[in-house]
Amino acid sequence: MECKERRLIGDLIALSYVEGLPVAEAAKRLCVTRQGLYKLLKQLRNEGYVAEGPLIKITQKGRDLLSSVLRDLLRYFNIASIRLIGRVISGLGEGAFYISLEGYRRAIEEKLGFTPFPGTLNIKLDPQYLPYRRYLDGLPGIVIPGFTNGLRTYGGVKAFKAKINGVEGAVVMPERTHHPTDVIEIIAPVKLRDALNLKDGDIVEVEILL
C-alpha cells in the first residue's frame, strides 16, 4: 500500500457511511463544512477513488482499497466471522432450479453437511457492509465444484458456512450470477422465509464463518 493511500483510508471510511447522499447532507452527517467536503472530494476524484456526480459514490478503486484494509484488520485481530445486515428481496426463482440439480445437491451435502432446501434467500446488503462482501471475493471459501450432465455445463460455486438470524445455512457465490454485488444468496436445510417468518423488506443478520 502506497503512502498516499494510507493517508486517504480514513477519509474513504468516513465517506462509506454517507455514500449515495448529496454533499450538503453528507457534510452535515460527517460534521464538516460543505467547503471542506468539496475540497476532500476533489482530491479523491483526482486520485480516482470517488466518482464524479451530485451524489457521493466510491469507485471500484476506492472499494478495492477499503477491502484490502478490511482484510488486513481481520487477519491482525484473528477474527473468525463477519456480520452482514440487509433486507430480504425476491429473486427470479433460479435458485430453486439450480439447488434441485443432483450435481449441486450432492456436493452441498458433502461439503456443507446438510441437504439444502430447493431455493435461495436473497438479501440486499446495506451499503456499509459492501466492503465485507467484496472481501469474501478474495477468500477461497468452500468450493462446490461445477459439473456437466451431458447436455449442459454448470459452473462452480464458492460457499461460506453462515448463520441467518441464528439458523445455520450458507452463503453461496456462483461463478455465474445475474445478481449485483450488493445481493447475496443464502441456502439452508429449511425454507428460511417460513422458518424465520420473513417477507420482502425484513431486516436479517448474516454471520459468515471464515
UniProtKB/Swiss-Prot annotation:
Q: Explain how, and how many, cofactor molecules are bound.
A: Binds 1 Mg(2+) ion per subunit.
GO terms in the biological process aspect are:
FMN biosynthetic process; riboflavin biosynthetic process
The coenzyme or cofactor needed here is: Mg(2+)
Instruction: Look up the domain of life of the source.
Output: Archaea
Annotated region described as Riboflavin kinase, given as residue ranges:
82-210
Recorded catalytic activity of this chain's protein: riboflavin + CTP = CDP + FMN + H(+)
Q: What is its EC number?
A: 2.7.1.161
Which GO-annotated molecular functions does the record name?
Answer: magnesium ion binding; nucleotide binding; riboflavin kinase activity
Which annotated residues bind CDP? Answer: 91-96, 190-193
The family annotation for this protein states:
Belongs to the archaeal riboflavin kinase family.
Against PANTHER family, the record matches this protein to: RIBOFLAVIN KINASE
What does the protein in this record do?
Catalyzes the CTP-dependent phosphorylation of riboflavin (vitamin B2) to form flavin mononucleotide (FMN).
Name the chain's protein.
Riboflavin kinase
